[in-house]
UniProtKB/Swiss-Prot annotation:
Pfam families: HTH_17
PROSITE patterns: EF_HAND_1 (PS00018)
Spans traversing the lipid bilayer: none
Organism name: Escherichia coli (strain K12)
Protein name listed in UniProt: Protein YkgV
Source domain of life: Bacteria
Induction behaviour: Expressed at low, approximately equal levels in exponential and stationary phases (at protein level).
Coiled-coil portions: none
């Protein structure tokens, strides 16, 4: 038996700009504009850049959504 636990690979660990746009209900270009102007919403983590494209960690985005939804309910 191995002491290592393999991650769940059924979902990608990374979220593209287009996927993030669908999740937070904004257009992809709006997110690109925020990145260009360095004006990401408070709490949204900076993306990783891979081959010139921006990718967010799924865990970070889910944490942002959880935090955002808690704030709105207050």
């Amino acid at each position: 038996m191995s002491a290592f636990k393999l991650p769940d690979t059924s979902q990608s660990q990374l979220i593209s700009t287009a996927e993030l746009a669908k999740i937070i209900s904004y257009k992809s270009q709006t997110i690109r504009k925020w990145l260009c102007q360095d004006k990401l919403p408070e709490g949204l983590p900076r993306p990783k850049q891979i081959n010139g494209r921006h990718y967010w960690l799924r865990k970070d985005v889910l944490d942002f959504i959880d935090t955002f939804s808690v704030r709105e309910s207050l």
